[in-house]
């Protein structure tokens, strides 16, 4: 099976609507991302429903806590059978290392463990507001390096940082990129954006795309077009 690069970000407050959308797309064409709102509303059973339909799930809960608590949450995600789970890199090396170590018993069945660097909505002024006098890109590199040194599989980063991070941290280090907008779609609330092909060419391994697919008249066709554009 080809490694699907597209991760569709589900963003629904109604489970029936979410599953109606999911039933219109093919698990061979993408993976699915479940975030905080949906997981809080619908719980682990919703993830199990997606698994029953054949989808791989990225559980996007961005855990950030003391090492013991964070690692146990990561283990719970592994027990749920998700394909990918993430933690905030700003939680530090001990937190990330504990989270990685708790997954070791799962072997090749363990989820990918990804660090979150700087949220794509954040600009330099936002970082300054929390006491960080640093450019977003510089802080991303710092946190991504810490993530790699902690033994995690990769980071979430904007497409603009992909090329730099691939060069700095190596090809095996996975880059998961939100803020992706196919040509012709609205920018939305993500500040640092790029098209799917541009992002992959820059070094992104996985592309998180939401509304351009979930709000499309024919989401399967949009997915097919994106996947086709990536094979050129």
UniProtKB/Swiss-Prot annotation:
Keywords tagged on the record: Decarboxylase, Lyase, Pyrimidine biosynthesis
InterPro entries tied to this protein: Aldolase_TIM, OMPdecase, OMPdecase_AS, OMPdecase_bac, OMPdeCOase_dom, RibuloseP-bd_barrel
Catalytic activity as recorded in UniProt: orotidine 5'-phosphate + H(+) = UMP + CO2
Active site, UniProt feature: 62 (proton donor)
EC identifiers of the protein: 4.1.1.23
Pfam family, one: OMPdecase
Gene Ontology cellular component terms for the protein in this record: cytosol
Record-linked CDD domains: OMP_decarboxylase_like
Pathway connected to this protein: Pyrimidine metabolism; UMP biosynthesis via de novo pathway; UMP from orotate: step 2/2
GO molecular function, a single term: orotidine-5'-phosphate decarboxylase activity
Positions annotated to bind substrate: 11, 33, 60-69, 120, 181, 190, 210-211
Disulfide bonds: none
GO biological process: 'de novo' pyrimidine nucleobase biosynthetic process; 'de novo' UMP biosynthetic process
Catalytic class of the enzyme: lyase
Lyase in keyword set: yes
Stated role: Catalyzes the decarboxylation of orotidine 5'-monophosphate (OMP) to uridine 5'-monophosphate (UMP).
Family label: Belongs to the OMP decarboxylase family. Type 1 subfamily.
Listed NCBIfam families: PRK00230.1, pyrF
Subunit-level organization: Homodimer.
UniProt-recorded name of the protein: Orotidine 5'-phosphate decarboxylase
Naturally occurring in which organism (per UniProt): Vibrio vulnificus (strain CMCP6)
Organismal lineage: Bacteria, Pseudomonadati, Pseudomonadota, Gammaproteobacteria, Vibrionales
